[in-house]
Design a protein with these regions (language model features):
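Aromatic/basic-lined ligand-recognition segments
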Residues: 225
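Structured aminoacyl-transfer and RNA-binding surfaces used for tRNA recognition/handling
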Residues: 1-220, 230-235
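Extended, domain-scale alpha-helical bundle/helix-rich regions
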Residues: 241-277
């Protein structure tokens, strides 16, 4: 029987008296990003407010649109859901460490390959780790977002990082785990393609195709879906097909004349996106 990872996470939170919320929108919680890139974005301003105390958890749909042209190469994420657990001056790192191990091993029945942590935290954090785990140091186990930062611990299963705990500001906890990655390790296979899911979520958030910001990302993803011949059915797809056809015709008529020009030139001068034609 396959494990329902999200249901198990909800059960895990309930058993540990941690309030749990299911977020459904990729709209960002501030104007620093086009879409919500992580589960902690809505809580980011609480880490430095020393009078705030408490613990909560969520699952947050996320969309990361860096390197759109590389989507599909197996290494660049697009749309995914992040399981998060956040504690503001309430849980200790040892508490958080015990909790995440319990979720991964007791609820999901996964076997931890190794645990990595920053060299500066070996002396302090190693006593939390059972001798049966392989421990490695990694200087990259340091998270930073502007002036907010923290050392972190990473957990690996089958050579894949499945979860991490950031000791944000030294007195807070930010735990994150990718839902789809955990589902794959638990034998759950989803049929929907990431580009299709991203398009669906952007439209659900009331964005429409346009030349800028969120609308441009939607337009770009629609174009990639058409290029990959993915089954897409929404009110914008025919309009996008027509736009791409016009670009293709213009490019064919002028490529000999301007063939050596860069992709940036074609886009800025004539609105032609070479990747789509």
């Amino acid at each position: 029987m396959k494990i329902n990872v999200l249901k198990e996470y909800e059960r895990f939170c309930e058993n540990n008296s941690i309030p749990f919320e299911v977020e459904t929108s990729i709209k960002p919680y501030n104007d620093s990003t086009l879409f919500c890139p992580s589960g902690m974005q809505q809580y980011a301003n609480l880490f430095e407010k020393k009078w705030i105390r408490g613990t909560c958890a969520n699952v947050q749909p996320c969309l990361r649109v860096n390197d759109l042209d590389k989507i599909g190469d197996g290494t660049h994420l697009l749309y995914f859901n992040m399981l998060g657990l956040f504690s503001f001056r309430e849980l200790t790192m040892k508490n958080a460490f015990d909790l995440i191990l319990s979720f991964l091993e007791d609820y999901l029945i996964l076997k931890i390959d190794k645990i990595t942590l920053h060299p500066d935290r070996v002396y302090e954090w190693t006593p939390y780790i059972n001798a049966r785990y392989k421990v490695e140091t990694d200087k990259d186990c340091l998270w930073t977002d502007g002036k907010t930062e923290g050392y972190c611990i990473e957990f690996y299963v089958d050579g894949i990082e499945v979860a991490n705990i950031v000791n944000t500001c030294g007195d807070c906890i930010d735990m994150g785990a990718g839902l789809e990655r955990l589902e794959k390790l638990c034998g759950v296979v989803k049929d929907i393609e990431p580009i299709q899911e991203a398009i669906k979520k952007i439209i659900e958030a009331d964005y429409t195709p346009s030349p800028t910001k969120q609308g441009y990302i939607l337009r770009k993803l629609l174009g990639l879906a058409i290029k990959k011949k993915l089954p897409i059915n929404n009110k914008f797809i025919e309009e996008e097909k027509s736009r791409i056809e016009k670009m293709q015709n213009f490019y064919k008529e002028n490529k000999d004349k301007f063939g050596k020009k860069s992709k940036e030139w074609w886009k800025e001068t004539h609105g032609v996106e070479i990747d789509l034609v």
